[in-house]
């Protein structure tokens, strides 16, 4: 702490990102990165941007990427916002859409950046308990609120809310912005983007870090009514008018256009997930139903924190959360078959 810090900074409780170890030979299953590389076509497109044009600023609107997203989802570019990772997109949403008199609502078990954003922007919030199956109860959200946000599939549980239930939540909150954070939707869910033309209060966020293997590039997006998108553009242009560099815009656009590679990669992750679930269950683990590129598991005879530490000693890193309701679970990223086997060998 410095004497130059403002009281505001002193009171901040920052987000703690997943560990990015520098040690070699570690099996890294802790931050939900895709074990397969980006689209070769996307890599080639990005290499093509490494030329003298880097002296020029990139397109502040990211129109090339917006067009690719719009074509992929059957919406218009005016319904698309792009930013420097979905975390930045979410930050603009919190800043621009959730500062009202009533509290923001989100699940008690969800993305741990949500309360951090609330602290940063002075947003009152209420964490609503998930049920015993780690699902949202629609009735719990029928109360005055400044907005609603939740990850679907849930992070860190991986549990999916079916699209018809998402629509029920929208119908129950016509006068509030409902944000569906779909970082993991491509691994087994149905996107709510299909609903944006029917609900002007719906905003869907996604990232290219997971299913499109571009975590190191930092590209995120939001899709919703043009009025909501305009609000995000106003925030963006009051903060950083050039959030995406030239290579990121082109590479992300091509990643959307290369559907064959994307679908093949997702299928490999899903297939590996289902195999690993069965293998862990055979070892006595309880594994929650997952529609993500990770699983959430616990063993009735093993303390999760101790197990994570012992796995690390064997060169395998997984994620352990100390939150009371989930303190006995481990979040395990789906790796390649070889990475998953290393996990099983370490457990043995």
From Swiss-Prot:
Pathway as given in its UniProt record: Amino-acid biosynthesis; L-histidine biosynthesis; L-histidine from 5-phospho-alpha-D-ribose 1-diphosphate: step 7/9
Keywords: Amino-acid biosynthesis, Aminotransferase, Histidine biosynthesis, Pyridoxal phosphate, Transferase
Source organism per UniProt: Pseudomonas putida (strain ATCC 700007 / DSM 6899 / JCM 31910 / BCRC 17059 / LMG 24140 / F1)
NCBIfam families cross-referenced by the UniProt entry: hisC (TIGR01141)
PANTHER family tied to this protein: HISTIDINOL-PHOSPHATE AMINOTRANSFERASE (PTHR43643:SF3), HISTIDINOL-PHOSPHATE AMINOTRANSFERASE 2 (PTHR43643)
Post-translational modification N6-(pyridoxal phosphate)lysine, affected residues: 210
Family: Belongs to the class-II pyridoxal-phosphate-dependent aminotransferase family. Histidinol-phosphate aminotransferase subfamily.
The protein's assembly and partners: Homodimer.
Domain of life according to the entry: Bacteria
The protein's enzyme class: transferase
Pfam families membership: Aminotran_1_2 (PF00155)
Full protein name: Histidinol-phosphate aminotransferase
